[in-house]
Amino acid sequence: MSDSQPCSTPSTRGKSDSGYIPGDDTWTQWRNIFAILTGQMTDEGKEQFRIARDIRNEAADCKRCEDQRDYLLQYSPIIRFLSDNIRQLRGDLSSHNIYCRRCTSRKAGGFDPEYGILLCANEMKDQGHLEDTMAHEMVHAYDHLRFKVDWTDNLRHAACTEIRASSLSGECRWAREFFRRGQWKFTQQHQECVRRRAILSVRARPGCKDEAHAEKVVNEVWDSCFRDTRPFDEIYR
């Protein structure tokens, strides 16, 4: 969980070559937004603007994340189902080990067998996005308990659990891909989304040489892992 951060205060230095102007007042924020819209801010400046915004909104983002997390744990069918199945494997995921934090890397969340689930509050778009992210990480938790996943050295294990998490969580359903990610295909959309996300995840692991290596590993386990819908009877959504 090293990429989650406590509260801090953005710099108050003057405008840099990136086009970003530090400051929390409304006028400065509008100047920055205008610079982005008119192409006067570099990618570096946009990243500085994003980080400052996330720091400024951290308390509100985390509070909203925690409220939605607690609601989903109580009322979401998919989250409750996964929680029950994890509990049957003598695991426990609840508000005490599902953490809402500001993350410094661009990701939605993560699972650690020792600590639990991290939800990146500053990356959550809405409650549906949070539900998909929780379900994704809970599938990882289920796999860790059910299949004894080797997270460190076995890329095939990593590829398999990523295939299952992307397929079963709902994050690759057609509406999510169509409206959120601009993927316009109607045929084989679900499979292509799952494969794409699994390759990206494997590619980011230290033991992976390159994208071709990641694709090879995903292809090796694809058939068996994509068909395995446990603990569901079928792909839920």
Curated annotation (Swiss-Prot):
A divalent metal cation binds at H136, H140. Keywords: Hydrolase, Membrane, Metal-binding, Metalloprotease, Mitochondrion, Mitochondrion inner membrane, Protease. GO terms for cellular component: mitochondrial inner membrane. The active site is at E137. Signal peptide: none annotated. Its EC number is 3.4.24.-. InterPro entries: Peptidase_M76_ATP23. GO terms for molecular function: metal ion binding; metalloendopeptidase activity. Residues 1-23 are annotated as: Disordered. It is a peripheral membrane protein. One of its GO terms (biological process) is mitochondrial proton-transporting ATP synthase complex assembly. It comes from the Eukaryota. Belongs to the peptidase M76 family. Has a dual role in the assembly of mitochondrial ATPase. Acts as a protease that removes N-terminal residues of mitochondrial ATPase CF(0) subunit 6 at the intermembrane space side. Also involved in the correct assembly of the membrane-embedded ATPase CF(0) particle, probably mediating association of subunit 6 with the subunit 9 ring. This is Mitochondrial inner membrane protease atp23. The gene is atp23.
